[in-house]
Regions:
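Mid-domain alpha/beta scaffold segments of enzyme catalytic cores
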Residues: 2-162, 166-174, 186, 190, ...
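Mid-to-C-terminal alpha-helical segments outside catalytic/metal-binding sites
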Residues: 2-17, 250-296
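Histidine/acidic-residue-rich catalytic or RNA/ligand-binding cores of hydrolases
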Residues: 34-36, 164-173, 196-201, 216-225, ...
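Short helix-capping segments at alpha-helix termini
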Residues: 82-84, 177-182, 228-229, 258-264
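Active-site glycine- and acidic-residue-rich loops that bind
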Residues: 98-103, 209-218
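Short acidic/histidine-rich active-site segments
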Residues: 230-246, 266
Length: 296
């Protein structure tokens, strides 16, 4: 077993039989990242990113702002990623922070079907709760209804910090009550030690978000994989305009290798699992440029 020195990143020069492992970042907000990040991610082994619709850092003034945003996700960002050999997919919704405005949310939800037939769209997300309010729950349920009617995959945002456990329970209960959506077609994101088993036991996929300060570190993510096993578990950077690291997934690869885990297990979490989850979307097509592996 090859062991890497402590406190170092994985080598970033792709070589035959070397340390680079191809990976997928299933949750990253590239519209808020500089183009140089695409290059760094490609050098580190990233071959595919999945970008959920999210908060811009401020509340948008009206529904047309979301139409422009959805065009950015489905058109411009895909081209920017392709320039560095990275495939780009996206999810559409109005985020939980703006869901307090139910009237605006309904206008945005009514707009989403215009974009759902785009081959780069994976489904509805990231929907969920922020402060666990009644309005947020109303908008979450209406997103679920759209997903059920259109048979779309769902990516769910769970609340931060003190609101996480209660919000996760509320989310799981609402999904359970929506009998038209199979649990394996939903990913519960931003899980931590006190919520991961709840989501897995409900039959959902889960995402671990690797943040420098909040949510989950690579070491804690490795602990959770050791605790729960690799089935239906994914890891992401959720990189955005805040304090985040677009190379967080390679940091997890390094941590897992440092602990002596087999590359096949690591690859399952950072590559195979995202492709399996995305593969439930009939629009999803992905082929590695190297021809080493594909998902049709």
């Amino acid at each position: 077993m090859l062991r890497l020195p402590e406190n170092s990143r994985p080598v970033v020069r792709p070589t035959e039989g070397g340390l680079i492992m191809q990976y997928v970042d299933p949750h990253i907000h590239m519209v808020s990242r500089v183009t140089d990040d695409y290059k760094r991610m490609a050098l580190a082994g990233c071959v595919l990113v999945s970008e959920p619709a999210f908060w811009a850092g401020f509340d948008r003034s009206g529904p047309e702002g979301f139409r422009d945003y959805f065009r950015q996700l489905t058109q411009f960002e895909r081209k920017r990623a392709a320039g560095y050999g990275i495939e780009h997919r996206c999810w559409l919704c109005i985020n939980a922070k703006e869901a307090e405005n139910v009237s605006l949310s309904r206008q945005v939800i009514a707009m989403i079907p215009e974009f759902l037939d785009d081959p780069g769209v994976l489904g509805i997300g990231e929907i969920g709760l922020n402060k666990n309010t009644r309005n947020e729950a109303t908008v979450f349920l209406e997103h679920l209804d759209l997903a059920a009617r259109r048979q779309e995959l769902v990516l769910v945002h769970t609340p931060h910090l003190a609101d996480k456990y209660q919000g996760t329970r509320m989310i799981l209960d609402m999904i359970h009550d929506e009998s038209r959506i199979s649990p394996e077609r939903v990913c519960i994101d931003h899980v931590e030690e006190h919520t991961i088993r709840l989501a897995l036991h409900a039959g959902h996929w889960v995402g671990m978000t690797l943040y420098p300060v909040t949510k989950c570190t690579p070491a804690r993510a490795a602990d959770m994989i050791e605790m729960c096993g690799p089935e239906r578990i994914m890891a992401n950077s959720a990189g955005d305009w805040g304090h985040s690291d677009p190379l967080a997934v390679p940091e997890l690869i390094f941590e897992m290798r440092r602990r002596g885990h087999d590359d096949a297990l690591i690859r399952k979490v950072v590559f195979d699992n995202p492709l399996s989850f995305f593969g439930q979307c009939p629009r999803f097509r992905f082929t590695l440029r190297s021809g080493a592996s594909s998902r049709e």
